[in-house]
């Protein structure tokens, strides 16, 4: 997305803003500083991004989110730390924390990053003259951060591949599926956390696929679960396949991310290898009560054993504990795909399964639990074409 002009980032539309709820609150109530007409005096001790403050100025009014949003993935970026702590060792934590602060923490979001301005990771700046919006504009908020993979897939920006049917036909926005409760880390009903007898706690999520799968395709397509939609493939495969196995098309993956600090400018930067197109089915690394599938789509994540080598050697000694081909939910769903053309589009087709020959030698051990050891054999008498 194109960056905003410097003046656009900070211009407050006084007339428009004063007519809103937040416009009836004094600037100093949120930003502190001094009540003075002199610019320099007024800006003394001012907090430019008050929703970042530990005092939690937003939660003084939005009390229902206090103590909840602070534990959400948007606020904590816990997914990063789950991976770093799993692959690292305690004695390397301080070094990794420094690297995290330099390179990863920009993805952290506060209330203001979604509801009044663009995220800091894309340069920031007000949406609309400091006017707060209850539902953020999708392409300037959600896909500003989740753009290189999810956004491009969903909006159909990957050349040669259509956008997701939910956007193309239904013009659905992210929040049509991902509710405010989910985005704020706020369960909306008991079953979102208490899903099975052995799962009776409500700890903050360790990563985005931790806990209950939400939303699910079946939330809007319940007949596919009940097996009453007269689609034989849904009945035959049942819960063995995630929906994306049949209804996703080619998506993007990327390889190692490497970080460093520029000797010239002193500023941190990162670089990733080239993005490439993939569609690979593997064994489900997140198999659970709510994700019972044997097979699911996998995406290569941008990490490598030496991602943080600028800061020290062997900082991730347990790198092989987690797969580099990870559980994926591509946002490019189609009714008809190459996989739905016939049974043997998948059965007996080695091109679409993650097999050991598709891995770099140094990645084999890390992905041993997601590699498909033997692909499903071709069937002699395919079931009738489900697309007909």
What positions do the PLM features span?
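C-type cytochrome heme-c attachment and multiheme electron-transfer modules
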Residues: 1-122, 131-388
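Active-site-proximal beta-alpha loop/turn segments in soluble metabolic enzymes
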Residues: 127
